[in-house]
Design a protein with these regions (language model features):
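Flexible, compositionally biased loop and terminal segments
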Residues: 1-201
Length: 201
């Protein structure tokens, strides 16, 4: 475990878990937050410095509006409630994705959280929100000002959303064997594990 620098998770199966428990999809998302907390705590115990979670993809806007509203409200409430504990445990929060499509209050919450935790060094937690890997690569290339001489592997990597070591391991729960447009560039040499269990399990 100590040789690992970065573990990434595609947290699939929250909604299905909620329905399986004869409850709502939203209930599954709520329980999924508890699993995120467990993974964060485990990372601290085993001294894994970076952990990433695929929270909301750029394709998730196709979901029912009520579910989307619940998800973002859950994010907002969580950070307002837990920001002191996050700071106390020296956890740094990074947000990757396009924030321009998010509501003002959600955007404000996310930006404030990253600002308040930017000096913390015990654990880096990356949250992919309104994230799509294809968008990330496009955004990186745009920063190069369409200069063909500067468009190369090194410069594209330099302009990705975060300048951090790429994941050593990716775990996707929920049974599906696909990457769903998550960190396609960064996962080139990553070991990938597909888990049948749903995320809250």
């Amino acid at each position: 475990m100590n040789n690992l620098n970065h573990i990434a998770f595609i947290m699939d199966g929250n909604g299905r878990w909620g329905l399986k428990k004869k409850n709502s999809r939203n209930y599954g998302h709520l329980e999924g937050v508890k699993t995120v907390q467990k993974m964060v705590e485990t990372s601290i115990v085993f001294k894994i410095p970076i952990i990433s979670f695929y929270v909301f993809s750029s394709e998730n806007w196709k979901r029912p509006r009520s579910e989307i509203n619940y998800l973002f409200n859950l994010i907002k409430i969580y950070f307002k409630k837990e920001i002191n504990n996050i700071t106390k445990n020296k956890i740094r929060i990074n947000i990757i994705g396009r924030l321009n499509n998010l509501s003002k209050d959600i955007k404000k919450t996310l930006i404030n959280t990253t600002r308040k935790t930017k000096k913390n060094k015990k654990l880096i937690v990356n949250l992919a929100i309104n994230y799509g890997s294809k968008n990330e690569i496009i955004d990186s290339i745009k920063k190069l000002n369409h200069n063909s001489k500067t468009i190369n592997e090194k410069n594209i990597e330099k302009n990705l959303y975060l300048n951090l070591p790429f994941p050593d391991i990716l775990v996707r729960t929920g049974g599906y064997k696909r990457l769903s447009n998550f960190m396609l560039w960064q996962l080139a040499y990553t070991e990938i594990f597909f888990e049948k269990k749903l995320w809250p399990d």
